[in-house]
Amino acid sequence: MKVENPGSFLDHFLRQTRIHHVQLSGMADMKANMMLTVASVVLTFTVGYLADPAFQWAALTLIAFCFASIVAAIYSVMPRVPLPSKNGARHDMKDPNYNPLFFGTFIHMTLEEYNEVMEHAVNDPSEAVELMVREIYTLGCFLAYRKYRYLRWAYLLFLSGLLIAGLVQALCVLLLNLGIEPWHIHLVPASPAGG
């Protein structure tokens, strides 16, 4: 990447873009934590309805969807950092995964190697800008394909669970009103007659 006029405008532009991405990451984490809390509370309250034959099917449906939503929300906030390899780092600017500004990359380097890479970058404005642009790009891809993708699934699963559980409950009530008793799961042993 060739930079014609590195200056304060470019620095401000790159800094603001990076700050925006970091704020989006924080918002995604906050939303995932909210979904974890809400789905966990709903799941906890719903478990009590499993023993009631009138609500069993709706409760099972809601529990399944809440659990799936919790898993998606956890996956959204779960850190993904490559473990250090024994092969050493590849210091190749042509490698799209090479980003010495990200700790997941420089944990593969010795301090001397990292100092050398950073010295070269800070003394070459074009390379420094390329590293910053690459970091913004990889952070944006991570947000789009990892955080927000699974966060969206968490919210969709939770909303679907609420709607489907409501429909299941309405169907069970309709069947009972028609005199058809839906099949019940006996989670609690029946008490003996007369005892």
Language-model segments: residues:
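Solvent-exposed, non-transmembrane helices and loops of integral membrane proteins
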Residues: 1-8, 87-138
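Histidine (H) residue identity feature
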Residues: 12, 20-21, 91, 108, ...
